[in-house]
Amino acid sequence: EAGHTVDVIGPKEGETYVGKHGYPQKAELSAKDAKAKNYDLVIIPGGTSPDHMRRSEHMVAFVREAVKLKKPLAAICHGPWMLCSTDVLKGTRATSYMSIVDDVRNAGANWVDEACVVDSKSGRSTVITSRTPDDLGAFMKAILSLIETGSAQGTKGKPVAPGWVK
């Protein structure tokens, strides 16, 4: 809708992956063949796909290459699971779906209950994270702003985590 080119990268080129709501998505390129240097930003989807993605050595290697090149990264819902496998979360502010709060914290992030968090410390990848599909508007606003202007702002939103998540 915003006029940007998007490539769907998966463990295997041509493989169709079906999300938890039944929507199919075909990988246009394998992670083994994809080069992070060719992309302005890497978006990691939510749902259970990041759990499968992080089991692929080539998917992890692609995201690690993006981190090394200081490419911006965006992850929503369970997407930060993939970031946990790359060391990019160390020292960042980040958010995620509440069931992976401990994973995000164990990866070194300061987890916060905000709709969209943008961590853009100098000298490293900008990391954009969001909690749930309800935060998709704030998530995409931050991504598009970063692509189009070079900077982005987070959105606090209403807290959604239960009291035991502190």
Residue ranges of predicted features:
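Active-site-adjacent substrate-recognition loops and nearby beta-strands
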Residues: 97
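Extended, subdomain-level signal for the structured scaffold at the beginning of enzyme domains
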Residues: 1-69, 73, 81-93, 101-166
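Catalytic nucleophile serine of serine hydrolases
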Residues: 77
